[in-house]
UniProtKB/Swiss-Prot annotation:
General function of this protein: The actual biological function of YdiB remains unclear, nor is it known whether 3-dehydroshikimate or quinate represents the natural substrate. Catalyzes the reversible NAD-dependent reduction of both 3-dehydroshikimate (DHSA) and 3-dehydroquinate to yield shikimate (SA) and quinate, respectively. It can use both NAD or NADP for catalysis, however it has higher catalytic efficiency with NAD.
Matching NCBIfam families: PRK12749.1
Cytoplasm is among the record's keywords: no
Protein name: Quinate/shikimate dehydrogenase
HAMAP family: Shikimate_DH_AroE, Shikimate_DH_YdiB
Domain of life: Bacteria
């Protein structure tokens, strides 16, 4: 790819960032489509995020992806949020239209799309959702919008717990889905929730390098064959949770599905063109 002065810049703002496959995936897609954009990753944490957004405007970047730990903070720095993004309280995509910034969240639509593509119908189902960060709440919000009956969200009593309660209130007030929030330390409640759940989704970074030997499921007997287990983490590809799930006879969806589908939607938001899905799946080794 020969980058010329006519090319526009798209970024990814996160910390840490070096593990991300998004730059490789998006640049392969842009090159295949013959579009004059290049995608670059920037190490940006909460402290440097405000300045980075000013830089985005000054450089007339087309937009940026937003990942941990900036997804919730980013809502404060855009001019407009989609209804779904308001429900989530976090964004992973910013589109810059001549200095007017729009915030979107494709994490939820991407993950739910991956579930649907596997042949699983979420309508009327119950999900146990681990975590209350930007990705997790995006998945919960989109699942609620698309027909989940109940979401049992588990999170430790950390800085995200109050945000989880606020998220649950927003979803309960605006959808037909019932969301409850429980401290993950309550292992009895966790076990009972899994016993009646249809889906278990890990929306935390537990399982991601350097936590690849960790899982929030301490007892594999809590997993049953009727449970669909899904991951947001894709590095490593096969997390400990997915290994546990397969040993227990569960159907699984790895983090590549969410990465692919949320990235496809981002691509279209930035470029106005269709994402070369089958090509990207092939060259990135994402499988069917």
């Amino acid at each position: 790819m020969d980058v010329t002065a006519k090319y526009e810049l798209i970024g990814l703002m996160a910390y840490p960032i070096r593990h991300s496959l998004s730059p490789e995936m998006q640049n392969k897609a842009l090159e295949k489509a013959g579009l004059p954009f290049t995608y670059m990753a920037f190490e940006v944490d909460n402290d440097s995020f405000p300045g980075a957004i000013e830089g985005l405007k000054a450089l007339k970047m087309r937009g940026t992806g937003v990942s941990m730990p900036n997804k919730q903070l980013a809502c404060e720095y855009v001019d407009e949020l989609t209804p779904a993004a308001k429900l989530v309280g976090a964004i992973n995509t910013i589109v810059n239209d001549d200095g007017y910034l729009r915030g979107y969240n494709t994490d939820g639509t991407g993950h739910i799309r991956a579930i649907k593509e596997s042949g699983f119908d979420i309508k009327g189902k119950t999900m146990v959702l681990l975590g209350a960060g930007g990705a997790s709440t995006a998945i919960g919000a989109q699942g609620a919008i698309e027909g989940l009956k109940e979401i049992k969200l588990f999170n430790r009593r950390d800085k995200f717990f109050d945000k989880a309660l606020a998220f649950a209130q927003r979803v309960n007030e605006n959808t037909d889905c019932v969301v409850t929030v429980t401290d993950l330390a309550d292992q009895q409640a966790f076990a009972e929730a899994l016993a009646s759940a249809d889906i278990l989704t890990n929306g935390t970074k537990v399982g991601m390098k350097p936590l690849e030997n960790k899982s929030l499921v301490n007892d594999i007997s809590l997993l049953h064959p009727g449970l669909l287990v899904t991951e947001c983490v894709y590095n490593p590809h096969m997390t400990k949770l997915l290994q546990q799930a397969q040993q227990a006879g569960c159907k699984t969806i790895d983090g590549y599905g969410m990465l692919l589908w949320q990235g496809a939607e981002q691509f279209t938001l930035w470029t106005g063109k269709d994402f070369p899905l089958e090509y990207v799946k092939q060259v990135m080794g994402f499988g069917a």
